[in-house]
């Protein structure tokens, strides 16, 4: 709960997660991503990768979900991702572990039953290589309204080196031999500052979001425990199961991929990402 957090606390999250083929396929297919790096092993190897590359949205979801039990299981809402950077590529069979530092705690001046916790998290693979680093802000309930909870912020945030693991260009590789597998108009020279794309695809979110969230080991009860919500429906947004925010975030990446990311060797950074409204089963992104 909010009163349990202090700036400077460090959590080495338990469990870890080995990315198996089932999880890879479930999330890659659900997201509607079209980048051949996530679909075609021969294409990925031609471009210098070891095999199929996990989409950035999947890497994000695996690592964020590992932090939930310690950080946001008692959250009202996940508010914002900040400076989300991607590092070493992630493959099927890689094991990811996560660590989080509490950067700041800010009790609400309007609602005494809640406040915002600001964290910095990092995900590493089995070789200790950083695969993702990000900050996020979470609105969290208080358990005891009378419990002391002071506003505080670290003077210096954790400095995490996160370098994209993009294979070097190799003149000896025949990249053009498989260029037909990606959309033609999504190369670097096709984009201009100020271009606006209205993406033509969408995806209905059904009750399958519960199973997808479970596959990630995300333990937040607002995504899976309707009985809990029914005990006090006014406390919870919409009074029903809310879709884990990483799912619509992942859909936004996938739906935009054929217009923006088909020829991307890697996503580098998301400077910010906000959850400005809830998604429920039956909504279309």
Residue ranges and their predicted role:
Residues 54-55, 87-92, 244, 276-282:
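Short, low-complexity cationic-aromatic patches
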Residues 77-88, 103-104, 266-273, 277:
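A cross-kingdom feature marking solvent-exposed beta-strand/loop segments within repeated
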Residues 17-18, 106, 117, 125, ...:
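Compositionally biased, intrinsically disordered low-complexity regions
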Residues 13, 82, 98, 117-119, ...:
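Hydrophobic residues positioned within well-ordered beta-strands of beta-sheet architectures
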Residues 1-81, 143-270:
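Hot-dog-fold acyl-thioester-processing enzymes
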Residues 2-3, 87-88, 187-189, 275-278:
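Short, surface-exposed secondary-structure edge patches
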Residues 2-7, 88-176, 281-283:
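HotDog/MaoC-like acyl-thioester-processing domains
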């Amino acid at each position: 709960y909010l009163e349990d957090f202090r700036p400077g606390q460090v959590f080495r999250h338990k469990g870890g997660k080995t990315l198996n083929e089932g999880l890879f396929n479930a999330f890659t297919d659900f997201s509607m991503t079209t980048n051949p790096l996530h679909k075609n092993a021969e294409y990925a190897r031609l471009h210098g990768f070891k095999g199929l590359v996990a989409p950035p949205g999947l890497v994000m979801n695996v690592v964020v979900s590992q932090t939930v039990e310690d950080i946001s299981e008692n959250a009202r809402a996940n508010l914002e991702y900040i400076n989300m950077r991607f590092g070493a590529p992630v493959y099927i069979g890689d094991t990811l572990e996560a660590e989080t530092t509490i950067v700041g705690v800010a009790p609400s001046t309007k609602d005494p039953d809640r406040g915002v916790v600001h964290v910095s998290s990092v995900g590493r693979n089995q070789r200790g290589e950083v695969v993702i680093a990000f900050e996020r802000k979470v609105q969290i309930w208080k358990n005891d309204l009378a419990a002391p909870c002071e506003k505080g912020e670290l003077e210096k945030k954790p400095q995490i080196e996160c370098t994209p693991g993009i294979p070097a260009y190799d003149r000896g590789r025949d990249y053009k031999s498989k260029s037909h597998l990606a959309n033609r108009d999504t190369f670097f020279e096709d984009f201009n500052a100020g271009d606006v794309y209205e993406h033509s695809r969408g995806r209905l979110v059904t009750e399958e979001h519960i199973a997808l969230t479970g596959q990630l080991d995300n333990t937040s009860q607002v995504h899976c425990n309707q009985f809990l919500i029914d005990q006090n429906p006014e406390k919870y947004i919409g009074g029903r199961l809310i879709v884990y925010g990483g799912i619509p975030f992942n859909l936004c990446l996938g739906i935009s991929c054929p217009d923006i990311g088909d020829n991307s060797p890697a996503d580098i950074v998301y400077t910010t990402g906000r959850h400005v409204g809830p998604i429920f089963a039956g909504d279309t992104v």
